[in-house]
Amino acid sequence: MNNYGIDIWSDDNFVIEDGLAKVNYKCKPSLISIVKDIRKQDFKGPLLLRFPHITEKQINTLYNTFNSSIKEYDYKGTFNAVFPLKVNQLPNFIHPLINEGKKFNYGLEAGSKAELVIAMTYNNVGSPITVNGFKDKEMIHLGFIAKSMGHNITIIIEGLNELEIIIEVLNETKMECPNIGLRVRLHSGGSGLWAKSGGINSKFGLTSTEILEAYELMEDNNLVKHLTMIHFHIGSAMNSIKPLKKALRESGHIYAELKNLGATNLNSINIGGGLAVEYNAYERTRFYSLTEFANDVIFTLKDIAKQKGVDEPNIFTESGRFISAASTVLITPVL
């Protein structure tokens, strides 16, 4: 019997029993029985089925795996995660995610004004919000408003102009400044289909020289105390973990040097996304497990902090597809 690679991509979320594809949960309903029930209600055309329990499972797996690695290596920093809203902004996905993530302080990542408004509206107060992407004055002002609402928000600047806008808004509004993060443009690139979105030739992030310029600008405007995070992203859906290790070492050294310069409140490294899931039905394309991923992140950052004599940083991830991909099934009529 052809199982269409379900043993490769399903991660036990779906199984084949008695010749039927079934949801591996509670009474194990078959997909075809779900479809028949929906058709009886006179719904036509393709169907998009969502399974919130799978989203909940992925959130728990991500946090439990990283927290287990933290315990194993006696790591002093904490693990934190935010969900990138660009992956899925629909209410029937976001509401279960917010509810399940509350116990972990799971947050949201926004890359546009619309996404930031969603995060400000639905994120659990106290859970982190990170802001990436292009930011004009209006979006940065929204970040200040989010801070005034009590949100734990970090605006991650990708160019010196964004830092200049933060200073401008701060001077105009006299509002409390949000946390500031620096996206660094590493020499290390990623692996897989989206590898070019990271590395030294990427259009995103600050070079080493620009990082120093940004630090001096923050010093001149009394903003160093708001610098809490450095961020990198070496590409989505990495099929190998080796490039991540290089990026962790490079970013770890930048973190340590900034700490030694005087950025005393800098306490976090955001490793971006990149955690892959299997899409292939014929062979495995991801050559690492989540446990290996977490162990390498924890071990590498602990080692660098020890070498440099600085505090072990808190760790942030922005994994999207790992959390969301498996929970949605598209079913189409066969012509």
For each predicted feature, which ranges?
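Short acidic, glycine/serine/threonine-rich loops at helix termini
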Residues: 93-96, 120-123, 140-145, 166-170, ...
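Active-site/ligand-binding-proximal alpha/beta "capping" segment
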Residues: 180-185, 190-227, 232, 241-253
